[in-house]
Every structure is written in structure tokens, then in C-alpha cells.
Design a protein with these regions (language model features):
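Non-catalytic, conserved peripheral segments adjacent to functional cores
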Residues: 1-110, 131, 138-195
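Conserved metal-binding segment of the jelly-roll/cupin
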Residues: 107-131
Length: 195
């Protein structure tokens, strides 16, 4: 496992170790032991995943930018098992020196990269291939009453989604999220969300 730190503390890119031969490849997509040994020390705390989700989407689908409000906050470990997506984490912690900044990473069926998004971040992705199968590991269960989001189309975030606007396909719910400037974040950099 290779861990790549990004420009925002706690947001990580994880590259699994692949074993290839004439038959194809094999890799461990997740090992709790290895995550605890290698990732937890970087984060400064443990993360215990309890729910796995999978979505299938077609080209131009954009999902996000989502989060769950306290006390049901979620960290996510995501990957693309089929196709290609641009995955994004946006820091929405009040008082954070990186508030409003984002990290974007391309996740594909070929690079096998995984992306760790901590609590206090909004998360979203755009499908860049004909179809994509996307998997999420979450460290808290889904609570619809705690659902939140900011607009995935907010140009002030400076995200290049690599999709022409006319091809963007959003759910009705995702078209109604507030822009960052109108958003009152439930997260604060001084509150430890992992206690």
C-alpha cells in the first residue's frame, strides 16, 4: 500500500499493491489491519468502516457535494471499480486554513487508486467514462435526516469537472444545494469529529 498525502491534511490517496501475472491481477482492496497500521498514524486516529455502498452511473452524471451533519458525520474511502470518475473532496470546516479548497483525483478501473475523505468535508464525483461503478466505504450509517450538501456547480470552488455543462446530469436534490457563500457549515476545525 502506497499512501500519498495531498495539499489538504487528512485527505489521502491510497494505491494498493497489485500482483499481476498472465491470468490478470489480484489485490487486497481493503485490510483493516493495514489501514490501522499505515493510515491511522497519518490521520492521528483510527477509522472503523461499517457500511459499503455501490453506485452505477453513466457519462456526465455528477453526484454531490454531499456530507452528513453531526452527530452522524462520515469519513469515506472510495474507489472506481469500473470506468473512470473525477472524485473531489471540499474542506467545509469553519476556521480551517483550507476552507473552501478542494482536492480532485481521477479514480479509474486501471489505476485502482482509492481516495480517503475525512469528516468535515463535502464529497462528490463526476463520471468521465461511458459508465462507472463506484464503491464507498463509510464509517457511519446513512442517516437521511442528517443529509447535507453544497452545490456541485458552484464555480467559486474552482473545480474543473472535465464535463461540458450541457452533459452534466444531476439529481433534482443535488440541483438545490446552496452555494458555498450562502452555506452555514455545521463543521468547525476546533471540534474533533473522531471522539
Amino acid at each position: 500500500m502506497n499512501i500519498i498525502k495531498t495539499d489538504i491534511e487528512g485527505v489521502l490517496i491510497i494505491e494498493p499493491r497489485l500482483f499481476r501475472d498472465a491470468r490478470g491481477y489480484f489485490f487486497e482492496s481493503f485490510s483493516e489491519r493495514e489501514f490501522e497500521e499505515k493510515v491511522a498514524p497519518i490521520l492521528g486516529h483510527s477509522v472503523h468502516f461499517c457500511q459499503d455502498n455501490e453506485s452505477m452511473s453513466s457519462y456526465g452524471v455528477m453526484r454531490g457535494l454531499h456530507f452528513q451533519r453531526p452527530p452522524y458525520t462520515q469519513s469515506k474511502l472510495v474507489r472506481c471499480v469500473k470506468g473512470r470518475v473525477l472524485d473531489v473532496a471540499v474542506d467545509i470546516r469553519k476556521g480551517s486554513p483550507t476552507y473552501g479548497r478542494h482536492v480532485a483525483v481521477e479514480l479509474t478501473e486501471d489505476n485502482h487508486r482509492q481516495f480517503f475523505i475525512p469528516k468535515g468535508f463535502a464529497h462528490g464525483f463526476a463520471v468521465l467514462s461511458e459508465t462507472a461503478v463506484f464503491q464507498y466505504k463509510c464509517d457511519n450509517f446513512y442517516h437521511p435526516e442528517a443529509d447535507g450538501g453544497i452545490s456541485i456547480l458552484d464555480e467559486t470552488l474552482g473545480i474543473d469537472w472535465k464535463i461540458p455543462t450541457e452533459h452534466a446530469n444531476l439529481s433534482e436534490k443535488d440541483t438545490k444545494h446552496a452555494m458555498l457563500k450562502d452555506f452555514d457549515s455545521p463543521f468547525d476545525i476546533n471540534v474533533n469529529l473522531y471522539k
